[in-house]
């Protein structure tokens, strides 16, 4: 997981990808990469002027696309956080290297408390309407990526 864009730079993001790839090659311990964008709007660190604004959507898209390339053969699953970037953003990330849209969630409040406005949960039907227009199959999976 890379929670990014509160205080670090793109150079730090790249360094993170390189280091986690090396760690994955040694341990095989990661099942996915989740590039969580910093939601700044109501975040205390942002309101105290101790952080930058959250990333632009372009930065978010590029981090996920570069992660797909950087982790090739090491980490197979790249997850988009729909609760942080919304349905439209998630669709775009699915076209830029992501293959996972995460979970349904129930009463999600961490991102909402920070200012995100993309909802507290999604139904399986909502996920289907998100991925099917892209010609992508919707699959239920376990935490370790076994499909059901």
What feature does the model see in each segment?
Residues 19:
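Glycine-rich anion-binding loops and their surrounding alpha/beta cores
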């Amino acid at each position: 997981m890379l929670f990014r864009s509160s205080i670090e730079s793109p150079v730090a993001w790249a360094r993170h990808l390189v280091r986690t790839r090396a760690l994955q090659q040694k341990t095989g311990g990661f099942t996915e990469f989740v590039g969580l964008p910093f939601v700044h709007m109501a975040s205390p660190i942002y309101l105290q002027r101790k952080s930058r604004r959250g990333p632009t959507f372009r930065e978010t898209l590029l981090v996920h696309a570069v992660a797909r390339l950087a982790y090739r053969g090491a980490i197979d699953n790249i997850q988009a956080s729909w609760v942080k970037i919304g349905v439209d953003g998630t669709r775009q990330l699915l076209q830029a290297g992501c293959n996972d849209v995460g979970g349904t969630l129930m009463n999600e409040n961490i991102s909402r408390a920070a200012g995100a406005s993309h909802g507290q949960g999604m139904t399986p039907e909502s996920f289907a309407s998100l991925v099917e227009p892209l010609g992508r199959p919707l699959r239920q999976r376990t935490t370790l990526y076994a499909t059901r």
